[in-house]
């Protein structure tokens, strides 16, 4: 049985109208109605008109948040030789080769937020699919996490690069900052994400691509947002 929302949540929800807000209106609203005592993450959720069971309708990609995410991500680099030194100098939190692969395999260790691997290590890293895959941590060339330029990849992740991927129900969930950020910074970050998702529309997708979108804080109610302006901008490019 679903738990009944608390009084604070219900009070916040009453301040949200049943309409689609412009993003510039929605962000100040979720800041106004917040009630949690901690610095919540602000998230965007987008329901897409795709069927992710078909490979040609998979939507995934990365976007660099112009204002970061308010949290320093822990980065693991799996590499060999000089690339290990390069990774350490670039600020990776954990660096290793086969030793790291063995640790993850034997301990199901996942105390990090992102994994970067050099191409020569992917034969070994491929064994880690059962541990890394379900957590969205598997390195992938499409997201820039399988690369020889480990320093650049580390810098981008530390600066706030977000990977997005549609789930099996056709929804993308992604963080765009902290509730303590200014409204302008959150609008800029959320705009970057929405634009990137629209740009990643599969060629075979038919009908309305973005079916609905909401923005919310960790504990707060969702506020529906109008993504039409972003689609218009994308079409004009």
From Swiss-Prot:
One cellular component (GO) term of this entry: large ribosomal subunit
MF (Gene Ontology): rRNA binding; structural constituent of ribosome; tRNA binding
Keywords: Repressor, Ribonucleoprotein, Ribosomal protein, RNA-binding, rRNA-binding, Translation regulation, tRNA-binding
Record-linked Gene3D superfamilies: 3.30.190.20, 3.40.50.790
CDD domains assigned to the protein according to its UniProt record, in alphabetical order: Ribosomal_L1
Subunit structure: Part of the 50S ribosomal subunit.
Protein family according to the UniProt entry: Belongs to the universal ribosomal protein uL1 family.
Protein's UniProt name: Large ribosomal subunit protein uL1
Originating organism: Solibacter usitatus (strain Ellin6076)
